[in-house]
């Protein structure tokens, strides 16, 4: 039932979601992923097969769930102004939770760096650890991320102004800048002079930058979906919630990376 037809019988602007199997499917898939990841890390052979199965199930369930959301908002007219506000508020709360996770990682880093234990030589970085220089690959990554923030803002303004070609070009450039960032980060990890097992320094460093790396992988998927939807004329000048949340996510990750760069690559090294 379209929004125009339903508005004759419904006295409120909210979307009453029809029964869906995807929330419970995603919940069980995530639980299976967490359990199998723990089993794999502790050397249980059965954990590998369950881990890959749960990853596939998570990706499939999330894809189908977002497919339904896109259909409800684009073709069925279910995303009224009130629903769009709710989606934006929900994503904002998700971003706040992500910021709090990184705040905990920074807390652990400062706790270890400002009061280094005697077991690591009483210095930071610990004795035997060669830190990655701030003027090496991390500086290039910082420039790439700042450039991506500029190109996505250009694309967003072009979308609002109805300039579809410029919006597509800006989004396409942004997508490839993020891909280059992820590749450079992978090269940095494979050539790093220390690992996640090298004491508290390696643990906190890879916990912070590695979590950001995983989020950048998620951002690539989100940008690719936005690019496909923009080419399919799913976005209008005033209705592009998916694009707005992706832009917010990119800017938040940009700011978090700046803190990571200043703290872990420049100050901490």
Curated annotation (Swiss-Prot):
User: Tell me, what's a Pfam family for it?
Assistant: COX3
- Which of the seven top EC classes does this enzyme belong to? translocase
Query: Which residue ranges traverse the bilayer?
Result: 21-41, 45-65, 90-110, 127-147, 167-187, 204-224, 247-267
Any one GO cellular component localisation term in the record:
mitochondrial inner membrane
Q: Which SUPFAM superfamilies match?
A: Cytochrome c oxidase subunit III-like
InterPro entries the record matches: Cyt_c/ubiquinol_Oxase_su3 (IPR024791), Cyt_c_oxase_su3_dom (IPR033945), Cyt_c_oxidase-like_su3 (IPR000298), Cyt_c_oxidase_su3-like_sf (IPR035973), Cyt_c_oxidase_su3_a-hlx (IPR013833)
Where does the record place it? Mitochondrion inner membrane
For molecular function, the Gene Ontology terms on record are: cytochrome-c oxidase activity
Instruction: Indicate where this protein is primarily found.
Output: mitochondrion
Similarity section: Belongs to the cytochrome c oxidase subunit 3 family.
The molecule here is called Cytochrome c oxidase subunit 3
Which source organism does the UniProt entry give?
Wickerhamomyces canadensis (Yeast)
Tell me the lineage of the source organism: Eukaryota, Fungi, Dikarya, Ascomycota, Saccharomycotina
């Amino acid at each position: 039932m379209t929004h125009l037809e339903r508005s004759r019988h419904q006295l409120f602007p909210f979307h009453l979601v029809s029964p869906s199997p995807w929330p419970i499917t995603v919940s069980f898939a995530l639980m299976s992923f967490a359990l199998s990841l723990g089993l794999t890390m502790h050397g249980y052979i059965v954990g590998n097969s369950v881990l890959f199965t749960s990853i596939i199930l998570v990706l499939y369930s999330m894809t189908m769930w977002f497919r339904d959301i896109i259909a409800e908002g684009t073709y069925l007219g279910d995303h009224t102004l009130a629903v769009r506000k709710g989606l934006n508020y929900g994503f904002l709360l998700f971003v706040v939770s992500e910021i709090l996770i990184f705040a905990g990682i920074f807390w652990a880093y400062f706790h270890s760096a400002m009061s280094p234990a005697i077991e690591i030589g009483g210095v930071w970085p610990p004795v035997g650890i060669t830190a990655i220089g701030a003027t090496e690959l991390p500086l290039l990554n910082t420039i790439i991320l700042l450039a991506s923030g500029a190109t996505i803002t250009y694309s967003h303004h072009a979308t609002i102004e109805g300039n579809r070609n410029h919006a597509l070009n800006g989004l396409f450039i942004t997508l490839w800048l993020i891909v280059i960032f992820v590749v450079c980060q992978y090269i940095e990890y494979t050539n790093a002079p220390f690992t996640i097992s090298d004491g508290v320094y390696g643990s906190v460093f890879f916990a912070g930058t590695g979590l950001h790396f995983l989020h950048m992988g998620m951002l690539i998927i989100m940008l690719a979906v936005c690019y496909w939807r923009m080419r399919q004329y799913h976005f209008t000048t005033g209705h592009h919630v998916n694009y707005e949340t992706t832009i917010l996510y990119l800017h938040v990750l940009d700011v978090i990376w700046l803190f990571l760069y200043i703290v872990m690559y420049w100050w901490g090294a």
